Structures are given as structure tokens and as C-alpha cells.
């Protein structure tokens, strides 16, 4: 044993000594056309993650480079990245890297999403050339460039979001909420939202300053947390550039922008500045509802490589971006005079990254990243109110009996009596979310013989907080009912994580195997909350096996072949809408006597219902697996990937019910009162609700009115996890045919199959508290349903989309023309209703007015009316006893008409016979046309026309057996143009 330990130590020391025998690479980066040096070019050694930045003379030096095979990548803003394989066995001096300017004079130009061929997971990149060609005005528009993606009409007046490998927004599992969005490493988060469980909106992100967008739809690195389905990484321009001015226009949106990358002094420092103004209108026929985006961005980059940092360079990048804007309908003459809606969409985003290249045997480099994102999303609406009589406006937040009073000028009245007449009032919600994140990561790249190994170890900390005050009014005297709920009083949600990942590349003969495996451990800490601390682990692994590759296969039929696969777990933190839902209030009018003087008197019982703490709440979890392959057949590149995603413990808010009683005094209780109606003065006890009538003349003694005790159910809301998972699966394909050289044309065929199925088998409660029992008292039964209280408790859908893109590039005239045909080949949806273990919860019924099952209760494959029953029901007197519903309901239909009528309020029936029918929409097509023309090096013009065939046909639905307009599925014909000037 001792010999084994000594041998291991000697081997380790030998390895370290071997690492010390490193080399130096120095060279120069040159413009291939002019042979002039390219300043600020970044040189990266891919296998060892070492880097350098070219100086004013284009020179660079990378020291302490270990022996072995490596890949040298040279990139610079405005140039095409150059990548070459090199063998390092000695010092390399005078290395010359020639890079070419990225413009339309190149023989090959790509205007589609490019596959990341070196990744073991599915990732695609959209570069600036592609973004210019499609004239992106909202970053979410790039979804149409993904396999099977469809082009939508740009509309900044609506909220735009990313949603990767998902279907409609109505699907279970909060699909868009799981898609992470980052801008230069700054995470945009919607965790601090109190209103919804959805992903971040992208309307306030500048598009003119974007250099590239990477979409990771496969298994992400463990470096990324708080994610569910996909990551979108947006990179802005960094580097020296000429002045650039852009003008974009389409019928609904106008944009103007200007940018410049300045070199600062003799240092390797650059300041990128960008300004943009975008204005969009909702409807050209009524151009008054609009959205404005006024943005300025600054990015400072610097390199410190002098003195003690000569061999250990330090690169600093600091970014600051601000946006002022939002939605406004104030000028709309079609709206009621004096009414308007204003929604702010202001933001301030700052980010910093520090990359320190150490090139030590035990560590390659350290990265420090920090970001903060602050938003001001205040919404205000001015509405017109018309009251034919006095109305009660409730604002109380304490339990008890309260009487409406005339406004006394203070802000602490429980019920304000709003007088009759007309009034205007401004109501709003003050919403100011803030997210900050700090991360520290250590990288170690080394090799063991021919095996390359890269390890990353990191920690990060992020926090979400909302500094808004919630709902408010500008005039409490005329405001409708609302309650104060201070967002800023709720605790911040903090999350800390540590992760470790190993990326190993193993040559196996002429093949190679790349394995990436990592583990992320997270803890969520919510001080001052009952949820306290929560912990989770997220393992992820991806692998890629390259079977055939290399330059020697250029003349072979099979030139490249690889297989890849992966599995990963990702955990999503909850939004504040789940952790701290806005409290609800049960307001019951308990006394409202008639008055001979016309003065209204309202007595209310207020019961606040704060959200219940759920000790069993866990964080939403996504489990994802994918298998893919890439093959090059005689120059035709084919990519195929299948995936499966399972969302577990999706966040939702559920209900439970409590029984309570209150004192109710109606008009009949005053019949025995001896005080004349004209002389009555009413008062109500705040604790008991007992009404006392006094004689305002003082002649008669006061009388206590005996009210009635009423029993009712009240609703409790609580954060919960969906008890059933949602499943998504699909297939994506991309076929890039070999370029047709005589006409310099490329053809791409891409598409996707997407499937979704979800059935909720968890037990939920529902009671129609607004209904009355047959005796006129509040409703007292609670239904316990499988999945949902509605007709269906699940759904399934399938889609097949295919796109054909033909791109012709004419380098001699610097022009590129593309046409894309988008086809929906299959669009299927169906509602489902399933009980636990095959039990039935929905039944065919023979009558549109009846609640009883038909003789043949089957329904899924028939066009019949249906009725849905709860599995059980419980009563006010014994809420813990679960009574089988169907058995009791059928018995009551024959033996107890009163019970039958009361229980029927828990049933749900369809009003048409095709609710559960399969819905196949017939195929439909659309065509888009785009052209970009460069005018020398000083200008370029792009034009597009989407749905330019103006396809206004109809589609057939197998569910309704009717035709409907394509306008519900395709955007109307629209067009746009962009002019870019460079000087």
C-alpha cells in the first residue's frame, strides 16, 4: 500500500514538472485584404482556454502554453472568426493570423441560425449578418430562425417572451418562465414578479447593439442555474468600430440608432457607445396606442498586461445600459375622453466581468462576474366611473364589521362611501423588481498525454427583491375597492450555488469522445419567511462521439459523422407570485337598510385571507434528455436531435376552504322596530355585527336588532406544486444542402416535431361560493376533483413545422437574397379528462340541461355532450369526511331533489358536443422574402416582405367541422426596410 502511495506521489510530481515545460506563442493579426494589423483582436487557445488581445500593431503573446494539440481562434468585431488546429512542441514565433472583414464580398455568407458543431449539447448562434438580414426589432423575433420556427408579426405593444422547446403559453409547467435570458452575462429575471409566473419580457432590450445571440436548447452547463427550458445569451458589440447609423421602418415600427466603438489612448481600451430610439404603434388605422424604447448603452473594455501582469494579463469589461419607455394610450381619440393607460418599461442594467489569465500548472484562470438589473414597471390607468347611487369602496385589511363612511381625508378608512355621480380615477401598480448576481469561477485546462481536460469550479450568489409599493390610487375618495400590499415589505429571495464541471476530450484512434459532466448544488435563503432555506442538486452530463472527421475525408461520401446525447436536471426558483401572493379578502354585505332620505348605509363583514404557508412546497424541476447526430454526406450537412423534457413540481396556487359564520341583518329584521324609518340612526358593533337603531329625535329608546347567524365557506389560497408532471418531446432536423456553385445558392430544409401531454391527477378543492343553497343560504358543499375543477384535467398537442430557405449570394454586387417558405404540416390539439388508475371523471350525457350520465357514458371518441363530476364532496358540518360524489348524486336524483339540486352546482357540463374531439387543423403555408444590398463599405440596405403571397385562405378544423380564416394562424402581409450608414 505504501509503495502504491509513493508511486502515485512520484507520478503526480512528474506530471507537474511536465506541465512546467511550457512554451510561448507570439504573432500578429492582420487584415487579409489590406495586410494591415488588426487592433483589439482576441486570440484564444481553445483546448487550454488561454488568450491574448492584439495591440495597436496587431501583436499578441501567449505564455506558458503546454505541449500538445490545440486550436487557435482569432476573432474581432466586424471580422470573420479564423480557426486553425496547431501542434505545440516548441516556441512559436511570428505566427500570422489573417482574418477577413465580415461583409457580403465573402464567398460564403450565412443568414440562418448556425449549429455549434463543437458542442456536446444543442446550441445555435445567430450572428450580426443574420440579424441585419431579418431586421430584428425585438430579440424574441429570432425564434423564427430556429428549426421549425415560424415568423410572427413584430408588435412591441404586446409583451414578447422567449419560450424554448415549448408550445402555447397555456401549457402546464409555466413554459416561458423556465427560459433564462442573459445580456452580456447579466441575468434578466422575473422572479420578483407578484402578478404572474411567466418569463421576462424582452421589449425593452435594444436590438441595434446586439452582436450575436446564442440559444442553448439542449443540456446547459452546470454554470447556469435558475433555469428550466433553454438559455438565450445575448452579446452586445465590444470592440473598435466606425460610426454606424441605422434607420428601420415598417408600417407599425420606426427605429433610429447610432453607435461607435472608440479606442482610448495608447492602451488596449475600447469604449462602445450606442443610442437607440424605437416607437411602435398597435394599429396603423388608429396609431395612438404606442410603445416607446429610448435606450443608451456604454461598454468599456480594457486589458492590463504591464508590470507584474505581463505574464498574467487581466481583462476588464464594464457595461451600463438604461432604457426609458413603455406603453401609452393617452392620445387615443377612440377611447372615452379623459381615459388612458400608461405602462412604464424602464430599466437600468449594469454588468462587470474580470478575466485573469494565470496559466499556472494548477489553475489556468479566474473569472469574476457581477451584474445588477433594476426595473420600473409602474402601470397607471385612468378610468371613468358612473354611479347612479352611492357605492361602498372597500379598503380594510382587518377582520370585523365595518360601516361605509364619507371620505375623511385620511388613507386609513376601511370602507369609503363614494357618492353618486361621475368621476375619474387613476389606479396603478408600483412594480420595481431588482436582481443582482455575483459569480466567481476558476478554470483549469490541462492534458494527460493526448487527453485534454478542462475543469471549472465556481460559486455564485444572486438575489431578487421588489421595491415597489403595489396597488395605489391617486384619489381615495373616488377609488374602487382595492387593498394596499407593499411589495417592498416582502423579504428578498437569495440563492447561493457551487458547481463543478469536467470537460474531457479523449482521442480514440481516429475518433474522439467528448464528455462533459457536472454537478450544481444550490441553496435558496429567504430570511423572514416561513420558507426559510431550501436546497437542491442538479446533475448534468453530455457526451459527443465523433466517428468520422478530418480534412482527408473531403472527397469521401461520408465526410463527417458524430453522435451525441445528454441528460440533465435543472431547478427553477419560484416567483414572488408564488411565495408572497397578494392576499385576498372575503367581503360580505351584511346590512343594507332602505332609507327614506336617500342616504345609503352599507355594513360589511371583512375577512382577510392571507396565503397559507405550505411546508411541502419544493422548487420546480426540469429533467431533460436528448439524443442527436450530425452527418455530412457529400457536402450535405444533416443534423438530427430528439429530446424529452419532464417538468415536475410546477408552481401553482391552489385553494382550500374553511367554514365560518357571521351575523347578517336583512330588511325583514327591522319590521319590528318601533322607531319611525325617517328618524332611524344605525350603528354596528365592529366585533359582533349586531345592529343598534337609535332615534335621532331622542324620544324613543334605542333598539337592538337581532340578526341571523349565517354559515358559509371561505377560500384559502396557498402555494403548491402540481402533483402531476408535464411531458414534452420532439424532434428537430436541419439539412443544409451542398452549395450550388454556379449560382452560389444554398438550400436549407429545417423543421420540428413537437409533442405535449399533461394530465393532472392531483386532488383539488372547489366550491362555488357565489352560489346559494336551495334554502337561500350561502353554499356549503366542497367538491374534490381529480386535477381540475373544470371539464378537462389535461390536454395533448402535436405539431409538425417545416421550413424551406433558399439563399442566393452574389459577392460581386455585394447582395444576398433569401426566400423562406414556412409550412404547418400538422397542428393537433385535444382536451383530456382522466381519473386516477383509469377511473372516469367525465361522462356522456343525453341532455343539454341534465346532469346525469347517458346509458353509454363513454365520450372520448364520440361527439356527445358531457358532464364532469368531482370524485368526492364534503359538507360544511363535516369537511373532513369525503363522500363519493357520483354514488350520492345518482341516489339524490331519485330520492332527494333538494340535495340533487344543491350538488348539481358542483357539476360541469359542456355546451357543445365536440369539446373532447380531436382537432386537426389543415396544413397551411406562408412565404417570406428578404434582400440585403451593400453599397461599398459605407452603406447597406435591407428589405423584407413577410407573407408576401398574402395568403388569406381558410383552414379546416376536424373538431368544429368548419372552415376559419388563416388570420388566426398567420400574420398579415407586412414589410419593412432598414438603411445602415457606416463612416
Please report, for each region that a protein language model flagged, where it lies by residue.
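N-terminal periplasmic accessory domains that precede
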Residues: 93-98, 139-142, 161-163, 182, ...
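Extracytoplasmic beta-strand/coil segments of soluble accessory domains associated
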Residues: 140-187
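Short strand-turn segments of transmembrane beta-barrel domains in outer membranes
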Residues: 203, 212-219, 231-262, 275-279, ...
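Gram-negative outer-membrane beta-barrel transporters
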Residues: 508-513, 663-845
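C-terminal beta-signal and adjacent terminal beta-strands/loops
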Residues: 647-649, 664, 822-911, 921-924, ...
